[in-house]
A protein has these predicted regions:
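Soluble or luminal CAZymes and related metallo-dependent hydrolases
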Residues: 23, 27, 81, 253, ...
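Conserved NTP/Mg2+-binding pocket subregion across the NTase superfamily
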Residues: 15-16, 84-191, 198
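Glycine- and acidic
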Residues: 14-18, 68, 243-248
Length: 277
């Protein structure tokens, strides 16, 4: 099925938000100004994507997703200055602590992401600012979404940097990531990690079945309707997400059920299960 869906004109989301009405617009503008101040002429472009652009953004809960493209490779940037800026900025806006995902990537690396050995510098929820040496091709889902749905906050059009990515490539990456989530160890993991895994798998299944990429909330509702016997677990994941990991999954029943549910969804995604939806 995946091989038959090779449409470059497919959009990732069925709806878009007005740029002037996006959530946290003042915060985003201030953060963009800080990033520009540190990078100066090294900044090629800065792009906002994710739920703050395409919908499903929950104030006080959702992350902000940004990609900063730079003219040099990330190893040549003043990473200490960027880290200090992140720390100071979140200190002024503590409600955004652990809610920023900013990816810094060199223009040449992003432009040839399928084959490039280049690195990324990333700050993300639960992780400090650091250089990641994994293949940038593993971030294909991000590159697709920022290219198809992102808002340019500064610089050149992202389509002039990221080469075209087909829907079938995005879909295949979604399937691979779902399988990775299934195989991750969640022994002793925090409640937020478990909720993220459940909702990520719901979204992956909905993406494969409906051929559209939507929000976690849309995916949860879609899966809940089709698998009512698992509604209680999906609801627990949603409640945990809204509490930012402070509520939910407090008993072994929920945690054990999580692994069963994730395996079931992964089998559905990979087409190994009986078609039941």
């Amino acid at each position: 099925m995946i091989g038959e869906l090779d449409r470059q004109d497919r959009v990732a989301e069925p709806h878009y938000m007005n740029r002037d009405e996006r959530p946290a617009a003042d915060f985003v503008a201030a953060l963009a100004s800080e990033i520009r101040g540190v990078l100066g002429d090294d900044l090629v472009g800065l792009y906002l994507y994710g739920s703050s652009v395409t919908g499903g953004f929950d104030p006080g809960v959702s992350d902000l997703d940004l990609v900063a493209v730079t003219s040099p490779e990330v190893e040549a940037l003043d990473l200490d200055a960027l880290e200090q800026m992140h720390h100071a900025f979140v200190g002024r806006y503590p409600e955004w602590r652990d809610r920023l995902e900013i990816v810094y990537v060199g223009r040449a690396t992003l432009g040839s992401f399928r084959t490039s050995p280049g690195s990324l510098a990333v700050i993300s929820p639960g992780e400090p600012f650091h250089v990641r040496n994994e293949r940038v091709a593993e971030w294909l889902q991000n590159w697709y979404l920022v290219r198809e749905t992102g808002i340019c906050l500064f610089g050149v059009d992202i389509a002039a940097i990221v080469p075209p990515i087909t829907w079938s490539e995005f879909l295949a990456a979604t399937v691979r990531y779902a399988d990775e989530v299934r195989n991750q160890s969640r022994l002793g993991a925090g409640d937020g990690v478990i909720a993220y895994a459940i909702l990520t798998m719901c979204r992956a299944l909905r993406t494969v079945r409906t051929q559209t990429h939507g929000s976690k909330q849309e995916a949860a509702a879609w899966t809940r309707e089709r698998m009512p016997e698992w509604a209680w677990l999906i609801d627990e994941a949603l409640a945990c997400r809204l509490s930012r990991g402070t509520a939910g999954f407090e008993d072994e029943r929920s945690r054990a059920a999580t692994e069963t549910f994730i395996a079931l969804l992964d089998d559905e995604i990979l087409g190994r299960a009986t078609n039941r939806m």
